[in-house]
From Swiss-Prot:
Species in which this protein is naturally found: Synechocystis sp. (strain ATCC 27184 / PCC 6803 / Kazusa)
Residues holding ATP: G105, K106, G107, G108, V109, G110, K111, S112
PROSITE patterns from the UniProt entry: MRP (PS01215)
Domain of life of the source: Bacteria
Keywords associated with the record: ATP-binding, Hydrolase, Iron, Iron-sulfur, Metal-binding, Nucleotide-binding
A biological process from GO: iron-sulfur cluster assembly
Protein name: Iron-sulfur cluster carrier protein
Role summary: Binds and transfers iron-sulfur (Fe-S) clusters to target apoproteins. Can hydrolyze ATP.
């Protein structure tokens, strides 16, 4: 006779491939029901962006079908993103579970392009995602998300004024670009910069978010210090190109996060090679090759992926439609989506270990 205990017993050896722990022990198997020869249950993953979802479901189905009398297995898949561990000297941001910095050692490496597309790719999996544009002196994210003319609404609350984030392509966002004229330069010293970043963290109605992606300014200055010293960080991602000078600066940025006690989730090599639109089967190493992989090995951090340079990637940023939306089957979009899923998996693993 089929019983719930019997189902859980055969599922107990099935492990989360990344956590290397039993799904049953992790409470990822819930709501087991038996109706004749049909066994159904809910599989609760640690992230909607789980890259190994199909493999886990397949392992569960195979395990349950070993029981005598089982004719059909129905698996409902949901996700509960774990909350990043809190720190006594850091202030959490409302209902935001995980804060992830996308950073670079120097400008011009496509950091904002990566941040925007990773945020949208995570939202496409069903996650609740926000994007904080912390590049105060050069806020480009509004343009890349098609929000150049948007305005932030201000609401009054018992805690003071609260900004309402702008929404597009499935994500919430705030940016200095919403608060100034397009041609207006931001000429601020450190204390003012720190103040606006803290306002974007604590005085924005973010609501419940699985991930808050922070598009950092280049370098290792006040903005990085403010973020890492204010909130518990789920991790940081370093964006570079294969070029030697870019890699040198990326190393400095990476070590800065490590010195601040922030987990570096990995390196993204952007502009890895160029794919000409008239010869899509060809690729040209405009900025060299192998730099990201070499830095990954030398610094002992993962290489999350390599993003090629395509015309569609640039056009998507200019038109305000990220390439993961406009051309999801392109090489760049596939690379960025895979990177987003890797980031989500590493963040969940760090929160549960």
């Amino acid at each position: 006779m089929l019983t719930t205990d019997a189902v859980l017993t055969v599922l107990r050896p099935v492990q989360d491939p990344e956590l290397q722990k039993s799904l049953v022990e992790l409470n990822m198997i819930r709501d087991v029901a038996i109706a004749g020869g049909t066994v159904s249950f809910t599989l609760v993953l640690t992230t909607p962006a789980c890259p190994l979802r199909e493999f886990i479901v397949e392992d569960c189905e195979k395990a349950v079908k070993t029981l005598p009398g089982v004719e059909k297995v129905e698996v409902k898949v949901t996700a509960e993103t774990p909350q990043q561990k809190s720190l006594p000297d850091r202030q959490s941001v409302g209902q935001v579970k995980n804060i992830i910095a996308i950073s670079s050692g120097k400008g011009g490496v496509g950091k904002s392009t990566v941040a925007v597309n990773v945020a949208v790719a995570l939202a496409q999996t069903g996650a609740a995602v926000g994007l904080l544009d912390a590049d105060i002196y050069g806020p480009n994210a509004p343009t890349m998300l098609g929000l150049s003319g948007a305005a932030v609404q201000v609401q009054n609350s018992p805690q003071g004024e609260v900004l309402e984030p702008v929404f597009n392509h499935g994500i919430k966002m705030v940016s200095m670009g919403f608060l100034i004229d397009p041609d207006q330069p931001v000429i601020w010293r450190g204390p003012m910069l720190n103040g606006i970043i803290r306002q974007f963290l604590y005085q924005v109605n973010w609501g419940a978010l699985d991930y808050l992606i922070v598009d950092m300014p280049p370098g290792t200055g006040d903005a990085q210090l403010t973020l890492t010293q204010s909130v518990p960080m789920a991790g940081a991602v370093i964006v570079t190109t294969p070029q030697t000078v870019s890699l040198l600066d990326a190393r400095r940025g990476l070590k800065m996060f490590q010195q601040m006690g922030v987990n570096v989730l990995g390196i993204v090599e952007n502009m890895s090679y160029f794919i000409p639109p008239d010869l899509p089967d060809r690729q040209y190493d405009l900025f060299g090759s192998g730099g990201g992989e070499k830095a990954s090995k030398e610094l002992n951090v993962p290489l999350l992926g390599c993003v090629p340079l395509e015309i569609g990637l640039r056009e998507g940023g200019d038109k305000g439609v990220p390439i993961v939306v406009s051309q999801p089957e392109s090489a760049s979009a596939k690379a960025l989506t895979a990177i987003a899923k890797q980031i989500a998996g590493k963040v969940s693993m760090a929160a549960l270990v």
